[in-house]
C-alpha cells in the first residue's frame, strides 16, 4: 500500500488524531522480528492483563495479521493502531478490520516500530525479541505517560521490572509480561 493511500485511508476513517511516523519505514525485512502470530488465548490474556478501558488508545507493535488490534477494538472498544513493516501483512490486516466492521476504531499502518511516535498511547502490546524490546525501551519511556501499560509476549523489556508475569500453557508455553509506566524518579 502506498503512503498516499495510507494517509487518504486514515483521513477517510477519521483516525488522523494518531501521531504519524517521523520517517518513512525502512524496506521490509524480517530482521526486526520474525512474524509469528500470538495464539488467540494469549491475545485474550494480554489484553485482559492490560485492563483496557473503552476509548483508550492501544498500539500493537509488529502487529502482523492485526489480531490484537481487532480484539482491542472489538472486545474492549479501544481505539487500536497496529504498526507493521510488511506491506502484505498490513493489507491483510486492513481487510480483516474492514470485514469485522471496525474501520472507525482500528487500523494497521505500515511503519517501523523504531520510528513510531506512540504519544497518547494508553497501552502498547508487542511480540518482539528481547533485543528489539531493548532498542524500543527509550522510545517507550519518551512517549508513554505515567499509567500507560506495556504488555510483551514471551520477551521481557531489559531493565524494566514487570508488575505482573503470567505463564500460559498450550501447545507451547508462553510468558506474558505486564509493565506499568511510573512517574520519573526525581
Language-model regions, residue ranges each:
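Bacterial N-terminal signal peptides
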Residues: 7-17
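Conserved SAM-binding loop of SAM-dependent methyltransferases across substrates and taxa
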Residues: 67-78
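A short SAM/SAH-binding and catalytic strip from SAM-dependent methyltransferases
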Residues: 119-135
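C-terminal substrate-binding/active-site "lid" region of AdoMet-derived donor-dependent transferases
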Residues: 131-186
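Conserved SAM-binding motif I beta-strand of class I
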Residues: 79-84
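S-adenosyl-L-methionine
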Residues: 86-120
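Class I SAM-dependent transferase core
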Residues: 18-53
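Conserved class I S-adenosyl-L-methionine
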Residues: 55-64
Amino acid at each position: 500500500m502506498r503512503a498516499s493511500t495510507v494517509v487518504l485511508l486514515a483521513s477517510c476513517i477519521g483516525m488522523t488524531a494518531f501521531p504519524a511516523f517521523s520517517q518513512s519505514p525502512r524496506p521490509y525485512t524480517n530482521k526486526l522480528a520474525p512474524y509469528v502470530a500470538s495464539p488467540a488465548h494469549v491475545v485474550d490474556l494480554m489484553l485482559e492483563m492490560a485492563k483496557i478501558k473503552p476509548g483508550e488508545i492501544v498500539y500493537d507493535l509488529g502487529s502482523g495479521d492485526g489480531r490484537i488490534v481487532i480484539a482491542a477494538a472489538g472486545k474492549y472498544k479501544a481505539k487500536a493502531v497496529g504498526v507493521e513493516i510488511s506491506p502484505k501483512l498490513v493489507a491483510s490486516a486492513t481487510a480483516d478490520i474492514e470485514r469485522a466492521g471496525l474501520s472507525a476504531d482500528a487500523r494497521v499502518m505500515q511503519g517501523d516500530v523504531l520510528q513510531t511516535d506512540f504519544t497518547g498511547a494508553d497501552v502498547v502490546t508487542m511480540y518482539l525479541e528481547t533485543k528489539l524490546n531493548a532498542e524500543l525501551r527509550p522510545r517507550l519511556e519518551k512517549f508513554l505517560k505515567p499509567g500507560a501499560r506495556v504488555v510483551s509476549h514471551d520477551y521481557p523489556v531489559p531493565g524494566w521490572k514487570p508488575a505482573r508475569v503470567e505463564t500460559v500453557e498450550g501447545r507451547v508455553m508462553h510468558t506474558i509480561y505486564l509493565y506499568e509506566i511510573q512517574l520519573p524518579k526525581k
